[in-house]
Structures are given as structure tokens and as C-alpha cells.
Amino acid sequence: MEGKWLLCLLLVLGTAAIQAHDGHDDDMIDIEDDLDDVIEEVEDSKSKSDTSTPPSPKVTYKAPVPTGEVYFADSFDRGSLSGWILSKAKKDDTDDEIAKYDGKWEVDEMKETKLPGDKGLVLMSRAKHHAISAKLNKPFLFDTKPLIVQYEVNFQNGIECGGAYVKLLSKTSELNLDQFHDKTPYTIMFGPDKCGEDYKLHFIFRHKNPKTGVYEEKHAKRPDADLKTYFTDKKTHLYTLILNPDNSFEILVDQSVVNSGNLLNDMTPPVNPSREIEDPEDRKPEDWDERPKIADPDAVKPDDWDEDAPSKIPDEEATKPEGWLDDEPEYIPDPDAEKPEDWDEDMDGEWEAPQIANPKCESAPGCGVWQRPMIDNPNYKGKWKPPMIDNPNYQGIWKPRKIPNPDFFEDLEPFRMTPFSAIGLELWSMTSDIFFDNFIISGDRRVVDDWANDGWGLKKAADGAAEPGVVGQMLEAAEERPWLWVVYILTVALPVFLVILFCCSGKKQSNAMEYKKTDAPQPDVKDEEGKEEEKNKGDEEEEEEKLEEKQKSDAEEDGGTGSQDEEDSKPKAEEDEILNRSPRNRKPRRE
């Protein structure tokens, strides 16, 4: 009960606040102005206090250095594009206006860097083709060492449609980096790519058919992990590809595995073709019967089957309702309508008033010619069809026969791919300021991990040092998603309200405790409490009258000792009265 009163009180206070707001708009404006002044003062004092407060410890940047043998490594901290070659090629089958690879590249720090001095390769322009590449220290040969490719990407402005993948360019005599374009042969393509709501993390390798010498792209299965955050959180992420001589592979993001598999089993299309194929010359015989069911040829239509019977018939038991207005139309011309002044009968034809519902039909069951309602025809059977039976001549679904695949081959070591001698980025992007950093290619996992700790690890530590607290993160999230304010308010206000409700609502004493304290009469049955009270009241009055008469007679007999007896009789009378009220001494109910 007290909880209900508290809820009512809150509703009343809320209503009063709304009414006060409606009646004192001018006062609220003044209050808002005062609050603005206070906020400005707080911000000024905060800025002053910030200047006096010592800054939080910062992570000092130091360029990573390879700790072992690498085929390629670049942290861009020298501040230039030296070692990288911009493409001068044009794309085939593309308009001249966009065929050129004229997208801009620069070496610069991130726009909101937490590590001063840390620079990277930045794709600067949007809606342009970009191509840049660099030679390896020496070509990578797929022999007994694993291949590990790793680099960092930060979508500083998010990403609408575009990629941030790398290509490992195949070692060929025709390789010319200043003519690097989309058709330049590559061995592996690896990295993130996104367009619309399709988030990808590519791993593609080009496999050479040992029989024909033709290369075919093999795509790894899609990762099971949700990749969206890596494209939208505007943080630097570390992408790693590991290929092992046993044909296994792993794809990691921020040093956590998001995809893994085997080159023989988890690529599409498969590396090795099937041993048998369907004979392209085989043809289905003309008498081949693929029908599992056929109409029973021995079935006969029953004599009483009427195919012409309609599905609906008029209800012969229906009668026209009383008051039906047969002579009144359901719609009539609007008597209040007037022909527009600009109506030209030569151009617009003869003017007719718009139709409105007949007002006479509103009080009647209906207007116009009455027709019997339609009901389902109990004799309707429809078109007769013979029942279906199993086809005794069913031969199954025809398939062409299998023959040995003339193009079959079996490559059990797809890891031994075409050697590559350069790394390149050939990208189209609708978003600018894509930041690349800390490329490394090696055959030693330890060297790559050390490089990651000295490069990406510092970025992660710097981001953690500058990361706002839990409250700050909640406020930032609410700024991006305003509906979170409702969640925060409910999360905070509801527990507070429950605590107040618990503290303010005292434990109510039970009725049994109350009766025990006062020795008041307690009804045996609550539903008959009213009747019992009326009956007990009459019995009490009768007992009191008898008690008074007895006291008077005792007083007359005792004379001088009457006063003392009266004093003794008072507590006794009160005790008798209490006993009479007790449910144990209550008289039986009168029927």
C-alpha cells in the first residue's frame, strides 16, 4: 500500500513539474541562461585546472627494428616514399578520365596520433585508382619455411567502399613496377575489403594447373568472426597471414585467429579437380520415365460427379430484411456540389456532381435491388481427376554417366606456390586517409611477433593510455547512439527507486500481533466479521445492564462497605467485559 502511495506521489510531482514548466516559460529561459553561465564558468575553471594538473604518462615512440631475417620490412619513419614506386599505368577497358592510377600517396602521421613521430603510408585521395609497390630484399621461395605477411591498417575516416589489401607480386621477367596495374600477376592477395555492408578479409592465391599451365584463383572460406568493428572503430588493426609448408594457414587480426584451414580442403574452387566428371556427350533416352507418380489409368469418374456444379449458390433460406429500400439507390449525386467556374464542357465534358452515400440508407438495412447472399454449394465437387498412384515404370532422375576426368591432376603441395619478388597495393577507394604501417614479410614467426610488439604494440599501449574511463566511454557511446541515454537512466533510476521504496515502506504488523497486544475480539471468519460485530454489540449491552443491576443491589445490602466494594467491582467488571468479548466465551450464533 505504501508503495502505491509512493508511486502516486511521484506521478503527482511529475505532473506538477510539467504544469510549472508550462506556466513559467519565461522563468525557465532565465534559469537556462543562468545554467549556461554556470557551465561556462565550470569549463573555464576546468581548463585552468587542466593546465595545472600534470599530464598523464605518454608512450614514447621508437621505430621498430627487425630482430632477424626478413624479406621485407618498412615502418616509414624515415618520412619519405623512398623504396616505393608509384604506378604510371592505365587500366584497360576503362574511361580515360578514371583509367589512370593517379591516386595520391604520402608518408605522414595519423591525424589523431597518440605516438608523435610514428609515420605510415597514407592513401590520400578518394574515388581514384591507386597503385604503389616496392621490391623485396630477395624473392620469397616456397620451400621449407613458412610465409608470414603482416601489416597495419587504420581507416581514419571509416570506409564506405574500398579495400586495404596487399598483393605479393609474382616473380616474372615481365614484372615492371612502374606499370603495376590490376592485371599484374600476383601470387597472394591478402587483407580487408568492404563495400556496402559486405565486410571481407581476403586470402586468395593463384594456383598453377600443372597440366595446362593456367593460373586459377583460389579463395579461402569466409571467417566466422564478425569483422565489422575492424572497419568502423577507427583504430589501428594488425593483419597477419601465416602459411605453413604442411598446407595449413591462419589469418589473425590483432594477434587473434579469425580464420584457419588447409589449402587442400578449405579453398574455393578446390585446388585439385575431381577424378571423374559427367560425360558431356551423354544424352537422356527418350523413353526414360522420371515421373514418381502417375494418374491411375483404371480409375473411372463416378456417375453422380457433376463437374458443372458452381462452387457458390444463392441462400434459398435467406429473406429480405424488413425496411429494405428497393427504390433507393445506394449512392446519389451530392446536392451541395457546384460546378466549378472554370469548367469547360467543350474541353472537360458534361459536368456531373460527385456521388455520395445516400443518407436514407443510413437508417435502413440496405438500399437498391436486394439479392440473396451466396453460400458454399454442398454438391460442388469441381473438376474430376483420377487419383495418383506409384509409377511402375519409374526409373529415377536421369544423370549423365561418369567418365574419367581428362583434366584431372593431384597437387598435394599447393603451398609450393609461384615465388614472388615485390609487394604492392592496387586499390580503389571512396574514402581517403587510409593509414598503412609496419609491413613485414618473413619466414620466422618470432621475428614477426617482435616487430608487432615494437610497432603495433606501442600503438595499442598509447591508445590504452589515452582511452577514457568507463564513464567517458559510456558518454561517447551515448553521443553516437542517443537511445543509450534511456538505458542509462533506467539502469540508474530503477535501483535507486527500489532502494527508496524498500527503505520507506516499513514492515506492517500482522493482524494476529495486533489482536494479541490489545486483546480485541478477532473474528473467526473474515467474511462474517460485520455480522459478528453487530451480534456481539447487542450481547455486550445486555451483559452491561445485568452487571449494573447487580452492583446496585450489592451496594444497598453492604451499606458502608459499598464504596470499597465498588472499587473492587470495577476491575472485575472490566475483566468480565474482556472475557465476554473473547471469542472463546462468545455465545453460540442464533439461527
Swiss-Prot record:
Post-translational changes noted in the entry: Phosphorylated at Ser-563 by MAPK3/ERK1. Phosphorylation by MAPK3/ERK1 increases its association with ribosomes. Palmitoylation by DHHC6 leads to the preferential localization to the perinuclear rough ER. It mediates the association of calnexin with the ribosome-translocon complex (RTC) which is required for efficient folding of glycosylated proteins.
Pfam family, one: Calreticulin
Positions of Ca(2+) binding: S75, D118, D437
Membrane topology (Cytoplasmic): 504-591
Gene3D superfamilies on file: 2.60.120.200, Calreticulin/calnexin, P domain (2.10.250.10)
Lumenal face of the membrane: 21-482
Annotated an alpha-D-glucoside binding sites: Y165, K167, Y186, D193, E426
Family listed: Belongs to the calreticulin family.
Name assigned to this protein: Calnexin
Species name: Rattus norvegicus
Organism ancestry: Eukaryota, Metazoa, Chordata, Craniata, Vertebrata
Gene name of the record: Canx
